[in-house]
Each structure stands twice: as C-alpha cells, then as structure tokens.
C-alpha cells in the first residue's frame, strides 16, 4: 500500500473517530494518533488531510449536499461522508493531485471501510463535484497552509 493511500485511510478513520464522538478538537486528534500511530512518512499528508477537512468542513459539506440528490450530509453513512470530505478537500485544495486520482482513491477507501453501495454512492456525488469544478461553477476559497494542530 502506498504512503498516500495509508494517509487517506488513517485520515478517514481519524475523521470518523472525531465525527462519532462529536469532538473535532486537537486533543481528540491527538488521542486518535496515540492509539493509531500514523507511519512517519504518511504523517504529513495525513495531517494535511485531517486539518484541511476540519478547517474547510462547512464549505465541503455544503458542496456534498448540493451535489447529492435528496441527501443531507448528517444522514449519510459516517464512512461515506468522511471519505467524500477527503476527496472534495483534495479536489479543491491539493493541486498536485489529479481529481480522478482523488475520486478513485475515495472509491477504493469507501469500498474497503463502507458498505457494498459505498463506492457507487461516493463516485456519483464527487464526480458531479469534479465536473462542476472543471466547468468553473464552484468558487474556491483556498485556505492558507493548514497547521498541524501540534499533534506529535
């Protein structure tokens, strides 16, 4: 498994952990990292994804809701919504990652951790977001570099 795939999987698990506990604090992220130690090489990308998603979550969730049909983010399966949050963050803010790579990775992570339908569900929504980004239909407010929240 590649470094970025491992970072994505751990980021999804960390976001899931914080989502289930309704606590997205730096202390909760630290608790996750204490129990599920990200490999050193995966750590920078892992932190970029987690912190980036948390910082941009209102914007990301609004896009997911806008491009899903009759779904509210909070009603989606926890795995699916956090996988999509990561993919949308990558498409909006990680210019070095082609959108199709973000989508394929999201589908694979969704299939691994979600339900039988997760891959198709995730693909349908984030591919619509990708097309809207490519058409210039989405305004992107790019944040400054995301801090690492002092997680060691």
Regions found by a protein language model. Name each.
Residues 1-152:
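N-terminal interaction/assembly modules
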